[in-house]
Curated annotation (Swiss-Prot):
Gene Ontology terms, MF aspect: toxin activity
Signal peptide feature range: 1-22
Species per Swiss-Prot/TrEMBL record: Anopheles darlingi
Keywords assigned: Blood coagulation cascade inhibiting toxin, Glycoprotein, Hemostasis impairing toxin, Secreted, Signal, Toxin
Predominant location: secreted
Sites where a glycan is attached: N45
Function: Salivary protein with anticoagulant activity that inhibits host thrombin (F2).
Domain of life: Eukaryota
Subcellular location: Secreted
Protein name: Salivary thrombin inhibitor anophelin
Renumbered residue ranges of the record's region Blocks active site cleft of host thrombin in a reverse direction compared to substrates: 70-73
Quaternary structure annotation from Swiss-Prot or TrEMBL: Interacts with human F2 (thrombin); the interaction results in thrombin inhibition.
Pfam families documented for this protein: Anophelin
Length: 81
């Protein structure tokens, strides 16, 4: 019983230490600073895609891929005679 109590108290101490380390560290009176993303330029959506581009994409979707043999399987394994 004492072992369980010791283990639970140790886990509580570890949890409190983790929470304390995760908290932001500021000096007394110091204001937190936040990153402002005002320097990033806005990029508009690319509208230069054409019907030909869509046709190429559609054609590529019907092509077979991932047809290599699975090295984890043995031929004939799992088949019943």
């Amino acid at each position: 019983m004492a072992n369980k109590l010791f283990l639970i108290s140790l886990l509580c101490v570890v949890l409190v230490a983790k929470i304390a380390q995760a908290a932001p560290q500021y000096a007394p009176g110091e204001e937190p600073s936040y990153d402002e993303d005002t320097d990033d330029k806005l990029i508009e959506n690319d509208t230069s895609i054409t019907d030909e581009d869509y046709a190429e994409i559609e054609a590529s979707l019907s092509q077979a891929f991932g047809t290599a043999a699975d090295p984890g399987r043995r031929l004939g394994e799992g088949k019943k005679p």
